[in-house]
């Protein structure tokens, strides 16, 4: 059986789809997947053994110059790639009108997705041949696992979902694997940031542990923050700019991770690494870290500035 997945973004949402592939792989011997995903996340599906072909899409970039000659050519090539094969099943796990109209509609095969009451944008359900009811009051991973089970005709396992990508990195770990922690300090929303003074206090509290700390970054202002956090601590390393695959390799070898609410915190969970995620205004209930050894540390008043470093340190030392 050949299946096309439409799950284009965000990083966390793409990662949250992986356990559903593992379920299907175990339920239907020989099943293979192609996957349409935003170009910035195209490395992720390739880490799962059940994925054959990754088809990058660039809707975010294309919409800035939709009718330019270059973008028209890219859109034509994308349409040809999506229509190159007729699929037994197409699963739109995105549930948005944009992806349904620009991607799912083009694909050849029976289209499955969530129904009017279940989809993130109800109008998206009009593009599907088969519509499934999936209750909203459950974690995003479980919703996607249920959608796949209904679309492919098996019972969703009751066990915790398995991302099944950690093994992709086991043979490529860095030489110092298990001897360092990673602090994921960068996120896109200001109210999700933990103050730099708190990060530095936590770094200081870990001095006696003998563990090294690595700080990744993705943009110049994040690099500048990482350098400020590391200043004066000889056991803290500011990493060079890295691809997503390279960051994943660093995370896969970490003894533990401390992160703000960001896509890389979900990548840490997908790699089965112990992680404490710091939450302020967001509710982790339906979209938080999913997996083994995923802990949450929340500010009492939803303001991360009021989450003491000592609280995070105590949780670290008691759990990891």
Residue ranges and their predicted role:
Residues 1-320:
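Catalytic machinery of carbohydrate-active enzymes
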